[in-house]
Amino acid sequence: MAKKVDKVVKLQIPAGKANPAPPVGPALGQAGVNIMGFCKEFNARTQDQAGLIIPVEISVYEDRSFTFITKTPPAPVLLKKAAGIEKGSGEPNKTKVATVTKDQVREIANSKMQDLNAADEEAAMRIIEGTARSMGIVVE
């Protein structure tokens, strides 16, 4: 018989840098998870993606065991990396902070495809372009 899921914890953690300090420790401690076990496993699984923020969904079972799924980094993080900027514009409709090419948008859309609610590559690109627009990034 399959184990029954007790809780689902969603976090965004820098790749390879999970440690028992907040926000990871308190969130997992409340769920009764072995915090160091999670941190070691997460860091091993994400060490090749250093510098990116990785969303993770942790399923905690009734017997306090857990499994987790790592997702692709959020689109704004990938857009900031592609554009080479620290943060988006405070007034995106007035102040443009950077420019990305269609090819960069296509690359981001392809990497995010599994997490986006899009039927095809074009729809995924439109989603990423909308995110870029709301950050004050121009798509050429």
Swiss-Prot record:
Recite the UniProt keywords alphabetically: Methylation, Ribonucleoprotein, Ribosomal protein, RNA-binding, rRNA-binding
An annotated GO cellular component: cytosolic large ribosomal subunit
Source domain of life is: Bacteria
Q: Does the keyword Transmembrane apply?
A: no
Annotated GO molecular function terms are: large ribosomal subunit rRNA binding; structural constituent of ribosome
> Known post-translational modifications?
One or more lysine residues are methylated.
Q: Name one GO biological process term.
A: translation
Tell me any Pfam family this protein matches: Ribosomal_L11_N
The cross-references to InterPro entries, in alphabetical order and at most eight, read: Ribosomal_uL11 (IPR000911), Ribosomal_uL11_bac-typ (IPR006519), Ribosomal_uL11_C (IPR020783), Ribosomal_uL11_C_sf (IPR036769), Ribosomal_uL11_CS (IPR020785), Ribosomal_uL11_N (IPR020784), Ribosomal_uL11_N_sf (IPR036796)
For this UniProt entry, which residues form the secretion signal? none
NCBIfam families, per database record? L11_bact
So what family is this one in? Belongs to the universal ribosomal protein uL11 family.
Oligomeric state and interaction partners are given as:
Part of the ribosomal stalk of the 50S ribosomal subunit. Interacts with L10 and the large rRNA to form the base of the stalk. L10 forms an elongated spine to which L12 dimers bind in a sequential fashion forming a multimeric L10(L12)X complex.
Protein role = Forms part of the ribosomal stalk which helps the ribosome interact with GTP-bound translation factors.
Put simply, this protein is called: Large ribosomal subunit protein uL11
Q: Which organism is it from?
A: Staphylococcus aureus (strain NCTC 8325 / PS 47)
The upper taxonomy is: Bacteria, Bacillati, Bacillota, Bacilli, Bacillales
